Amino acid sequence: MFEVFVKKVNSDIVIRWLLTKITIPIADISAVTTDDTYSGKEKQAIRIGMPYGTTDRVVIITKKNTYILFTTNYIAIQKKLNSYIHSL
């Protein structure tokens, strides 16, 4: 229930968490990485998910914003995002 969900819709990535829905054009994504700090290195990032001690962080860097996804399933989300980016 508190997990972050990521899916591809046409040429966009849709991120859902609780009542939040964020749409990012795939063409705007420049990198997908991980972050091992507690709150994320990027101070101005948009944070999505529950930031508690055992979560990992997936970072999406776009032309305009940086998004930090707090998740316990970071490998699957990172693989999914990379496959969406390389499918264009």
Q: How would you name each of these model-derived features?
A:
Residues 23-38:
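Phosphoinositide-dependent membrane-docking surfaces
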Residues 79-88:
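Glycine-rich, low-complexity intrinsically disordered segments
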Residues 36-54:
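An anionic, turn-rich surface loop/hairpin at beta-sheet edges
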Residues 20, 30, 64-67:
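A structural signal for the main folded, soluble domain(s) of proteins
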Residues 1-25:
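Conserved beta-hairpin
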Residues 13-16, 32, 69:
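Short hydrophobic/aromatic-rich beta-strand segments that constitute the beta-sheet cores
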Residues 51-76:
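Canonical phosphoinositide-binding patch of PH/PH-like domains
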Residues 19, 28, 73:
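A short beta-strand motif that forms part of the nucleic acid-binding face
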